[in-house]
């Protein structure tokens, strides 16, 4: 299946179970720590990198048990001292805290196995997470797809596999849930169907680990063979099958801003996922995009409510900035090593325009069409025109592969070879790749 053509399927019915990788569980900790005068850095916990860090998430159809499984993982690992238990209600409601009038999402789960440190996300209801998944800004290193033994594969099972493939997830582990409610023959049938589906969407269906169990039994401490033991087998499979991602740590630092928070008397915090490079506390950085070019110093770094001496590629972290006001910053700006990135407003890109059947436009469009462009965490209006002025009356039709000139209403940091998506009215118009910078 052409993954570009399949992109729009990701957005059909993808509501409640969006996973939001870049949202900030640590932000409340940042604000609380940096604003309590009695506390000093010496009092705070330090994040120690004893194990490789991997970003993971649960995906799958609504009500198949993703959140219950996430809670069960934290419960089973908490008994080993490798996690803090979070029950279903803590995860499902995506709890928010207000600090100085700022609403902060905090449904990000942290845990460890014997071999790795994991950031696991399961945040139902965050509609804006779709934007991150479109652009690949919140790419997971691996995923657990949950499928109910009572239903088998369902529409969102397929959609989420497409989503995972589109954002670059190469390895997935399957958890067949609710096995206590069906006969063994049904479990075998679901496993066979899942292997076929994985192969259909470009995964290794023959060798993908499939674990059967009951997340609810594990959570409630019942029937250990399908409860606790299944969680143990699942995490062993995740450890062994999902390879450690290669992080680009020896290149200049870059992080797209996801959120911005103001801390009175201390500075401003920006949060996001480090795309590449390494950043040490005390380093000078530039913030670029939307016509702004700011310079400042990083006075603090935190992840999972713990201090970091340095942020590296793959980290979901918060940066405390000196002498920068919240009003100067916005989502979509880029934090980077000074002199390494530049904003652009005009470039050439190679497009695939989705068809009506794929959820795209029903009709074509002509020159000066103005949809929204999503790149990393940026969201900006773009005007599309043909490279050859003689083609200005030529209509671009759904299903076309075409080169277009993109002109943004505001400059953003965008690079040759970078992928992006254009959308209109809540649906995806096309996917594209930057082929040439024109300014």
From Swiss-Prot:
The keyword Transit peptide applies. Its main location: mitochondrion. It holds the Pfam family GTP_EFTU_D3. Disulfide bonds: none annotated. Residues 122-125 are annotated as: G3. GTP binds at residues 60-67, 122-126, 177-180. Residues 101-105 are annotated as: G2. Residues 214-216 are annotated as: G5. Residues 60-67 are annotated as: G1. GO terms for biological process: mitochondrial translation; mitochondrial translational elongation. The keyword GTP-binding applies. Keywords: Elongation factor, GTP-binding, Mitochondrion, Nucleotide-binding, Protein biosynthesis, Transit peptide. Residues 51-246 form the tr-type G domain. Belongs to the TRAFAC class translation factor GTPase superfamily. Classic translation factor GTPase family. EF-Tu/EF-1A subfamily. This is Elongation factor Tu, mitochondrial. It comes from Schizosaccharomyces pombe (strain 972 / ATCC 24843). The gene is tuf1.
